[in-house]
Each structure stands twice: as C-alpha cells, then as structure tokens.
C-alpha cells in the first residue's frame, strides 16, 4: 500500500495517525478527498466519502489488482473489503456480511453496486452456465429494484426509499449459486405526495418518458408527468446526478431489458406497466357531491368517469365494481348481514389514496419475490454438495432529517439506531469486554452507547412503538395529539426525549404536534400527524376482493388475502411499526451471526457538488458514526483473535513441534512454540483461551508459510489415502475372486450334472443324441459349452460313420467336401446316389470305348506316373473361337486332362492339378462346370453322355476335387452362380443356362461376348 500511496496523500489508515484527535482525523480526511482518495481504512473498517463524480477507480483492471490480495497490500478500496469478505467466506467457510451505513446521499447504493460487481467478476472461473445465470440476476436485480424502490430527494438524487439486505449463496468452490433479497419498509406514502424538489419513484417517470407512443396510447397515458397528481411535483426534475448517469428514457429500456434477463415473462412486464398506469389514473380521480342516486351513493360521484374506465381496463376488473369500491364500502354486521356504507368525499379520497399506496407496495413486494424465485438455489443437497456459505450485503436507508419528519423517518432512524447499536456491540463493547475477560492488558476507550435510545423506541409496553400500537388498537377515537400526550406522560424524564409540552420554551417545536428524539446522529423533530394512520396501514376489504378477482394473473397473485369471505372475522393484523421492529430484530440477529465487514459512508456536502467537503457537516457524521472511537479501539486492540485450538488446527503444519499433533502440556504452550519458531511472539498476546494477534502482517506471514506446505501435505495425504484405497480395493478383489472361484465351481458342477442327466441316453442308436436340447450355460461357461458341443459332434459323427465299410470312406469324404464347398447353394448335387468317379472306364457309361480308354489310361499312367483317377466323364465343351466339341475329362491326382474321344482319347490338353484354383457351377440341375486354372484359359464344359441320361454328376466332380485339395492342405474356391464369368485369353465373358423342354441334348449357343448352355428341361 505504501508503494502506491506516498505521504502527499495522507495516511491510508486512520490508525496510523500520529495523534487521535478530531482535528487530525478531519485534516487527513480532507487531504485524501482533495487528492481523489475517497477511501480510507480504520483497521478493517472502510471509510468512504461520496465524490459526486465518476472516478477512474473501478473496472476489470482495478478488480485484477485487488483480487486475492490482503487489505494492506493495496490502497484502500471497496474491492479490498469485498475481497476480504469473499476470502473469509471461501477459505474459512464463514458466513460474512458487508454492512454499508451512512446518511442519505452518502453513496451507500453505489458502494453496494461496486461490491456486487467485484463478486461477480472474481467468481465462476470455469464459466458454468448456471453460475453465470445467477450472476446476471444478481447484477440486473439492482437496476430493477432501483427503478421501483428509489426516488430523488432533496438530499440524494437516487435515494433508496426502502431497505435492502441481500444474501448471496456460494458453493464450496466459492461460486455464487443463488441469493435472496429482503426488503424493509418501502416509503409508500411517496406515491401520493412528495416534498418540493423531490420526485415520486423512478418507475413512474421512466414509464412516461421511456415508453413508445403506441404503448402510452394503450395505457391511456400522456408523456408529460405534470398531467398526473402523483407525479406533477417532480415533473420538471430528472433522476440524473450528473451527465454520466442515464436519463429516464434510457433507464426505462435498461430496466425492461434487466427484467427480461432476470426471467420476467413479456406478459409479466406488461402487467407491471399496466399496474403503474392504473396507479397514475387512480391518483387523478376526484370526487364531487351530487344529488343523484344509483351507484353514486348519498350524492357522491366521480368527476371524470373515463378514469374509472381506464383503471378497470388496466386492472382487468369490472367497471361497476371499481366504481362501487371507490364510492362505498361493504360492512358485515353482527348478524353476518352485509351493509353497504357510502363514503363522503373525504373518505373516498382517503380510500383512493390507501388503495394506490397498497397497490404499489404489493407490486414492489411481488417484484422482489419474483427476483427471489429466480435466484433461489436449485436442487441443493448439503449431504451431496456440502455446506453453502453466504455473503450478506446490507444497503439500507441512511439517517434522515427533513424539515418535516413523519412516521417513515422515525422508522428509518430507528433502523439506523439498531445498526449503530450492533456496530457498538461488535466493534467497541464486545471487543473491550473480551479483552477484560481474557486478561489482556489494554487502554479502555470511552464511547457513547445508544442502547437507551433503542430502548426508548422498542421497549415493551412503554416504548414509542408499543404506545403507538396501543393507540391504534383502542376502541375509542384516539387522535395523534392524544398519542403525543401519552408519550409525554411515559417519557417526560427520559434524557433523549422531549416535546413542546415538556419544554415550553423551545419554539422550534409546535405544541400538540411535535416531539424530539436525541439520536446518536443528532436531534430529530418528528410530527405525529399521520402516525396512527400510517401505523394502522388500513385498506378496505372491498379493494382486496376487487383486485383478487382480477383476470390479470400477475395482479391477482399480489392479493391472496382478497379471497377470504366478506363475512369472515379475521385477527387484527400486526401494525406497520411492529412488523418493521420485528424485521429489524431479525436483521440484527442475522448480521450478528456473521463475520461483519463495515463500510462507513460520509456525505461531503449538502449541495451534492463534486470536489467540495464541508468540514462541519463531515465532522458531525464522524462524531455520530463513532469513527474516532473506532480508531482508538483499533490502536489499542488487536487485528485478530482465535481460540488456541482453532489456531493450531490451521497453522500446526508450519511447526515441527506441533505437526501432526503436539506433545506439549497445553494448546497454549503449543501455540507459543509455533510462534517462537516463526519469530512472531512479540506481535501477539496470550489470553486465557484465545490468542490475540496485533498486526495483520503476522497472519499473512503464517498464511504464506501454510500455503507453501499445503501442497506437500496434500500429496502426503493423497498418497496415504490412495494407498488405503488400493489396499481396500485389493482386499475386496481378493474376496470377489474367491467368491467367483467357488461360485464358478458350483456352476460348473451343476452344469456338468445337468449335462450328464440329459445325455444319459445319447449312446442309443440311431439318433445318438441328435434330439437332445443343450442346457443354457452361464456366460462364464460358454467357451466350455462350445468345446463340449464340438466334442459331442465329433463323437456323434464317429458313431455314425464307424459302421461304414472302409471302401466307402473316400466317397463319404468327397460328399462331405462337396456339401461344404457348395454350402447349400445348389439344388441337387447327387448326394443320394453312389459315386463311381471313373465313368469312362465303366462299361455301363462307355460300352463301346471303355477298353480303348483303359489302354489310353495305362499309357498316361506310365508316362506321368499319377497314382489314382479322381474323376472321368464325357463332356461337351466350347472354346474361345465359339467351337463346340465332344471331349472327355480326366481328373487324376496330378493332372487335369482334356481328351478327344473320337481320336482314341488322345490328350488335347493337360493342366497340372496344382494349377487348378477353383471351379464355378450354377444353382440348378444342369451339368455346366467352369474350371479355373492359374495362367490358363478357363475350361467350359457340360458333363455329357451319362447313364442314365442327364445324371447329376457336378456335385461328384466338386466333391472329389475339393477333398483332394483339402488333403494337400490348400483351398479350392467354389462359386455358385447362375451367370458365371470366365476368361479366355484375358477377355471377360459370361455364360448362363437356358432350360428348353424341346432340347434333345445339351448344347452351347454362342453370341458376341457370351455363351448360353441350352439344357433340356424335364
């Protein structure tokens, strides 16, 4: 921090002042303000002065400078406080809150915006879509709530007219997962009337000035706010503080877009605009006395009934009911009889105003609840997702003193008294009491305790709110003057209360109207006029029923209490003051349960002028905020305190005497040894149960040592844990394998027993178990089952063939080979007849030339030395020249011969059998065979001149050739096709079969590029 801010900028922390006096404090504050340094620390409390101008202190670059840094490492800034709260939440799993306080116009709302922007910028590094959605809603909600809850006042151009406390929920990684907004005491009386120089809520002016002409026409509105009673006071004013802020026209578009991003449907946005327009029209309704009857009860009428039409249309309610609700009210008598009582003009005006205030309040509450419904964390389970942590941001109205202060200012200032009391308890009172309790020597600091002022307001039975509630609940006529007299009677001796009756010489107060409270921030005179009425916050049930019965679902949802029966007797509702007191008590309890961070905002001048600091005005704020006392406590106190056990739990790994567990006499002794090893014992004090650390630098030193050791410890723990997991896994696997082994044994035994039972009769001929159904094996036994099935098939085949004579085995093997080669693609392949193989040597097939063939066969055997004849038959062949000849085919174990039967079976062609690579046949009953040989033309033949005629011998040729190839260990390629491709001298041709009934014997027909076998069909 000192590197970036030199002495010319003053002290960045008021604790560093040489002398703690008001003069030194103000001198340092003014110097820093003049140098553009609007932020200054008091320890961890940030003092912020509103500059009333844009300063280059914000944005992504500034966020990067403060992200992850300690408070003292950078100049004072809102980002530093936001970062400290975020780190405390993320690293220590502590719920934290940032309390932003100060009077109206001190810059609290802007401070809360910058805090939200910082949190949104530093979270969700992994860009999760759900987290981005939540961040967008958090940021956009501020824009929407400002439109409906902020207004221009004489002290602030963008004053929050409601209190806001926002909880932001974070997951264990520190990413926002949701949030919740609590609103407090909307100043709904502003809807009706504003002081000179002030405006109504921004939403009305944004609607009138930012809507398109078409939308204004549909809403029956004019663009000029001066036309409407509720907005004419501020019609000539704008919401802008200076030229950098958006105008009403631009803000309307920004708010509409923000509502869309948050999740408001187009219908809901339209309903909101209609409700705002209805309120404006309602404010223009005037009542006049007439002599007519009918709906205009007792001579009361609406001056301009077109306004009633507009209100009825915009609220989606019947016109007659709207008019009746304005002119009269329904009362249930004791006998549950309904009586309609007409209003006077004054009563009707009161009812109209009460309705307008209530509708706007319900609209604001609905907007807040709608935003909350979008922001609520979804699907969170602490057992699965871990504990959520929270950062709360409190932006609530500041202390207010107006020329005329009413019930709203009384509640606002009571709220500030409660927050000041919390600040005193947490920062001043509790701190000093803890030092005394722990036996820490220090210099006591005197401070003003405002508990007596809080007690004056909220004390049961005698407090101002209790007296006000009693006045509201009394059966008789109790006026505001009587209420004031009761206050005077109860508090005439109270040091912080006075009135004109108690102090007749004080002519600044009006007799019978004013009382004064000496607040911690100064004296405020309150006018009791309207106190009872505003506290009752009464609205006739007729309006509630009217709006509940609206056909607009958005408006209807705002009035659930309108559904109760008109004759139903209900409990008296809590008053506005009591509700506000209860909400303040709950808020303070909520804040007290969190680790607080404070931003104390100071308003530099009443003129809202940049660069001007009114010393007297600021001195007064410094005094009532207790900042000087805070400096004294901070200088005399300690930056941090922790129980010894918690301190050891976090830092014990930084000392050899305390890691992993110490053996010293007590935690206090262990902490002392740890600090002594680091050389930090001079900056701490030892209490009875806690360690008090004076400087934040000591904590940072310990945190840095811890951060260096954490990766090593994590690796050690990971190694140990992974080893444990591996051992657990190993033991489980061993147990699993043992169970699997025994289970498999059981399943194998059971399966084998079942197989044995089923196959007891498998040896019985002639089926040998062919009809037996195999049991379904377990998956693990499937390979075993497959092996058993293969063995069974081999055994059964053996049983079937063992009785076949050895002489028939070659024929059986050939048939098996043919069946495998043809794969069932040929209709008939002669498996049912006996295969003779050598048909040319048979006198039956070759009666005239069998002896001649035998001589030729002997000659070839002597010449080529083959061992056996595999197949022989007469064939009819066609060659590449389209010549058709009768030939003989001889297949031996070494050669394939083509013989000429007309020339004593002379050899026309001899092909080595090893060159034959395959053959092609058709799927029909014809005898066409195409033999394929390596490096030779394909041989196209048709088996011919068989006995009986047209006997099917193709399967026999395929079988003997395939069986021989299997015996040699090579594969014969057999193709079955009705259109067979063949090759002659490299020319591709096709051959097909054409059955002909009139064909006497097989023959070939040649065409260009193809052949056709003409086959006699039987």
Curated annotation (Swiss-Prot):
<dbReference type="GO" id="GO:0030175">
    <property type="term" value="C:filopodium"/>
</dbReference>
<keyword id="KW-0472">Membrane</keyword>
<dbReference type="GO" id="GO:0031589">
    <property type="term" value="P:cell-substrate adhesion"/>
</dbReference>
<dbReference type="GO" id="GO:0072678">
    <property type="term" value="P:T cell migration"/>
</dbReference>
<feature type="binding site">
    <location>
        <begin position="102"/>
        <end position="109"/>
    </location>
    <ligand>
        <name>ATP</name>
    </ligand>
</feature>
<dbReference type="GO" id="GO:0006897">
    <property type="term" value="P:endocytosis"/>
</dbReference>
<keyword id="KW-0009">Actin-binding</keyword>
<dbReference type="GO" id="GO:0005886">
    <property type="term" value="C:plasma membrane"/>
</dbReference>
<keyword id="KW-0966">Cell projection</keyword>
<feature type="domain" description="Myosin motor">
    <location>
        <begin position="9"/>
        <end position="707"/>
    </location>
</feature>
<dbReference type="GO" id="GO:0001891">
    <property type="term" value="C:phagocytic cup"/>
</dbReference>
<keyword id="KW-0505">Motor protein</keyword>
<protein>
    <recommendedName>
        <fullName>Unconventional myosin-Ig</fullName>
    </recommendedName>
</protein>
<dbReference type="GO" id="GO:0007015">
    <property type="term" value="P:actin filament organization"/>
</dbReference>
<feature type="domain" description="IQ">
    <location>
        <begin position="710"/>
        <end position="739"/>
    </location>
</feature>
<dbReference type="GO" id="GO:0005516">
    <property type="term" value="F:calmodulin binding"/>
</dbReference>
<keyword id="KW-0391">Immunity</keyword>
<dbReference type="GO" id="GO:0038096">
    <property type="term" value="P:Fc-gamma receptor signaling pathway involved in phagocytosis"/>
</dbReference>
<dbReference type="GO" id="GO:0005547">
    <property type="term" value="F:phosphatidylinositol-3,4,5-trisphosphate binding"/>
</dbReference>
<keyword id="KW-0007">Acetylation</keyword>
<dbReference type="GO" id="GO:0070062">
    <property type="term" value="C:extracellular exosome"/>
</dbReference>
<feature type="domain" description="TH1">
    <location>
        <begin position="824"/>
        <end position="1017"/>
    </location>
</feature>
<dbReference type="Pfam" id="PF06017">
    <property type="entry name" value="Myosin_TH1"/>
</dbReference>
<comment type="similarity">
    <text>Belongs to the TRAFAC class myosin-kinesin ATPase superfamily. Myosin family.</text>
</comment>
<dbReference type="GO" id="GO:0051015">
    <property type="term" value="F:actin filament binding"/>
</dbReference>
<keyword id="KW-0547">Nucleotide-binding</keyword>
<dbReference type="GO" id="GO:0015629">
    <property type="term" value="C:actin cytoskeleton"/>
</dbReference>
<dbReference type="GO" id="GO:0016020">
    <property type="term" value="C:membrane"/>
</dbReference>
<comment type="function">
    <text>Unconventional myosin required during immune response for detection of rare antigen-presenting cells by regulating T-cell migration. Unconventional myosins are actin-based motor molecules with ATPase activity and serve in intracellular movements. Acts as a regulator of T-cell migration by generating membrane tension, enforcing cell-intrinsic meandering search, thereby enhancing detection of rare antigens during lymph-node surveillance, enabling pathogen eradication. Also required in B-cells, where it regulates different membrane/cytoskeleton-dependent processes.</text>
</comment>
<dbReference type="GO" id="GO:0030027">
    <property type="term" value="C:lamellipodium"/>
</dbReference>
<dbReference type="GO" id="GO:0043325">
    <property type="term" value="F:phosphatidylinositol-3,4-bisphosphate binding"/>
</dbReference>
<dbReference type="GO" id="GO:0005546">
    <property type="term" value="F:phosphatidylinositol-4,5-bisphosphate binding"/>
</dbReference>
<dbReference type="GO" id="GO:0000146">
    <property type="term" value="F:microfilament motor activity"/>
</dbReference>
<dbReference type="GO" id="GO:0120117">
    <property type="term" value="P:T cell meandering migration"/>
</dbReference>
<comment type="subunit">
    <text>Interacts with calmodulin; via its IQ motifs.</text>
</comment>
<dbReference type="GO" id="GO:0006887">
    <property type="term" value="P:exocytosis"/>
</dbReference>
<dbReference type="InterPro" id="IPR036961">
    <property type="entry name" value="Kinesin_motor_dom_sf"/>
</dbReference>
<keyword id="KW-0518">Myosin</keyword>
<keyword id="KW-0112">Calmodulin-binding</keyword>
<feature type="region of interest" description="Actin-binding">
    <location>
        <begin position="584"/>
        <end position="606"/>
    </location>
</feature>
<dbReference type="InterPro" id="IPR001609">
    <property type="entry name" value="Myosin_head_motor_dom-like"/>
</dbReference>
<keyword id="KW-1003">Cell membrane</keyword>
């Amino acid at each position: 921090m000192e590197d970036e801010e030199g002495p010319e900028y003053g002290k960045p922390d008021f604790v560093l002042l040489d002398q703690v006096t008001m003069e030194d404090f103000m001198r340092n504050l003014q110097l820093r303000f003049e140098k553009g340094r609007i932020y200054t620390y008091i320890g961890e409390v940030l003092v912020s002065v509103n500059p009333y101008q844009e300063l280059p202190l914000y944005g992504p670059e500034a966020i990067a400078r403060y992200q992850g840094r300690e408070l003292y490492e950078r100049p004072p800034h809102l980002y530093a406080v936001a970062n400290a709260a975020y780190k405390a939440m993320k690293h220590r799993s502590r719920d934290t809150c940032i309390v932003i306080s100060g009077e109206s116009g001190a810059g609290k709302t802007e401070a809360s915006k910058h805090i939200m922007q910082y949190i949104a910028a530093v979270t969700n590094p992994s860009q999760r879509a759900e987290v981005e959605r939540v961040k967008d809603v958090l940021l956009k909600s501020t824009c929407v709530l400002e439109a409906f809850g902020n207004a221009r006042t004489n002290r602030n151009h963008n004053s929050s007219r409601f209190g806001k406390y926002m909880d932001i929920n974070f997951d264990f990684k520190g990413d926002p997962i949701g949030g919740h907004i609590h609103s407090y005491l909307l100043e709904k009386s502003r809807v009706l009337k504003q002081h000179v120089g002030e405006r109504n809520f921004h939403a009305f002016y944004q609607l009138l000035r930012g809507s398109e002409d078409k939308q204004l026409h549909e809403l029956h509105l004019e663009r000029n706010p001066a036309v409407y009673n509720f907005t004419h006071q501020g019609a000539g004013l704008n919401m802008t503080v200076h030229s950098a802020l958006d105008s009403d026209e631009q803000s309307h578009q920004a708010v509409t877009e923000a509502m869309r991003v948050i999740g408001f449907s187009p219908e809901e946005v339209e309903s909101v605009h209609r409700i705002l327009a209805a309120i404006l029209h309602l404010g223009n309704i005037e009542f006049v006395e007439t002599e007519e009857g009918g709906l205009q009860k007792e001579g009361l009428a609406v001056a301009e009934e077109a306004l009633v039409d507009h209100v009825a249309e915009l609220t989606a309610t019947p016109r007659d009911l709207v008019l009746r609700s304005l002119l009269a009210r329904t009362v249930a008598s004791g006998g549950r009889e309904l009586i309609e009582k007409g209003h006077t003009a004054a009563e009707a005006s009161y009812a109209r105003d009460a309705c307008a205030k209530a509708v706007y309040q319900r609209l604001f509450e609905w907007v807040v609840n709608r935003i909350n419904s979008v922001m609520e964390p979804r699907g969170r389970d602490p057992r699965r997702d871990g504990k959520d942590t929270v950062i709360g941001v409190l932006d609530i109205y500041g202390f207010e003193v107006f020329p005329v202060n009413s019930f709203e200012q009384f509640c606002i200032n009571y709220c500030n008294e409660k927050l000041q009391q919390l600040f005193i308890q947490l920062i001043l009172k509790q701190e000093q009491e803890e030092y005394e309790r722990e036996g820490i020597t220090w210099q006591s600091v005197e401070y003003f305790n405002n508990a007596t002022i809080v007690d004056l307001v909220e004390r049961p039975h005698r407090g101002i709110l209790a007296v006000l509630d009693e006045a509201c609940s009394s059966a008789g006529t109790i006026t505001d003057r009587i209420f004031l007299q009761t206050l005077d009677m109860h508090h005439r001796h109270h040091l912080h209360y006075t009135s004109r009756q108690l102090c007749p010489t004080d002519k600044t107060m009006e007799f019978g109207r004013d009382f004064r409270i000496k607040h911690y921030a100064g004296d405020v005179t309150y006018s009791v006029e309207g106190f009872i009425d505003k506290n009752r916050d009464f609205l006739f049930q007729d309006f509630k029923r009217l709006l509940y019965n609206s056909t607009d679902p958005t408006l209807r949802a705002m009035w659930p209490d309108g559904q109760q029966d008109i004759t139903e007797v209900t409990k008296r509702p809590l008053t506005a003051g009591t509700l506000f007191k209860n909400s303040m008590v709950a808020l303070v309890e909520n804040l007290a349960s969190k680790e607080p961070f404070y931003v104390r905002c100071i308003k530099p001048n009443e003129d809202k002028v940049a660069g001007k600091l009114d010393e007297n005005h600021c001195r007064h704020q410094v005094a009532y905020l207790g900042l000087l006392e805070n400096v004294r406590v901070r200088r005399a106190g300690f930056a941090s305190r922790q129980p010894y056990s918690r301190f050891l739990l976090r830092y014990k790994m930084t000392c050899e005497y305390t890691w992993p567990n110490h053996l010293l006499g007590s935690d206090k002794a262990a902490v002392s040894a740890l600090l002594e090893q680091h050389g930090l014992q001079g900056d701490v004090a030892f209490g009875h149960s806690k360690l008090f650390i004076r400087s934040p630098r000591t904590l940072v030193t310990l945190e840095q040592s811890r951060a260096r050791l954490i990766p090593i410890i994590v690796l050690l723990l990971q190694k140990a844990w992974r080893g444990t997991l591996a051992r657990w896994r190993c033991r489980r696997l061993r147990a699993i394998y043992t169970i699997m082994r025994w289970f498999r044994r059981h399943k194998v035994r059971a399966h084998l027993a079942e197989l044995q039972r089923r196959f007891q009769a498998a040896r019985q001929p002639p089926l040998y178990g062919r009809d037996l159904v195999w049991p379904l094996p377990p998956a693990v036994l499937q390979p075993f089952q497959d092996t058993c099935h293969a063995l069974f098939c081999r055994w059964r085949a053996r049983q079937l063939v063992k009785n076949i004579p050895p002489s028939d085995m070659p024929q059986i093997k050939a048939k098996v080979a043919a069946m495998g080669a043809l794969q069932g693609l040929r209709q008939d392949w002669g498996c049912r007849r006996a295969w003779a193989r050598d048909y040319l040597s048979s006198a039956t097939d070759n009666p005239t030339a069998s002896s001649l063939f035998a001589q030729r066969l002997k000659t070839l055997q002597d010449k080529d030395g083959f061992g056996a004849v595999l197949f022989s038959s007469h064939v009819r062949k066609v060659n590449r020249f389209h010549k058709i000849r009768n030939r003989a085919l001889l297949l031996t174990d070494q050669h394939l011969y083509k013989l000429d039967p007309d020339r004593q079976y002379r050899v026309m062609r001899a092909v080595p059998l090893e060159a034959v690579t395959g053959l092609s046949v058709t799927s029909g009953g014809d005898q066409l065979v195409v033999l394929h040989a390596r490096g030779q033309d394909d041989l196209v033949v048709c088996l011919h001149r068989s006995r009986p005629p047209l006997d099917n011998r193709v399967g026999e040729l395929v079988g003997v050739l395939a069986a021989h190839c299997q015996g040699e260990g090579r594969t014969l390629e057999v193709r079955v096709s009705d259109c067979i491709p063949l090759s002659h001298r490299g020319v591709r041709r096709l051959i097909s079969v054409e059955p002909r009934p009139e064909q006497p014997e097989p023959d070939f027909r040649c065409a260009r590029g193809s052949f056709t076998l003409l086959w006699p069909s039987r």
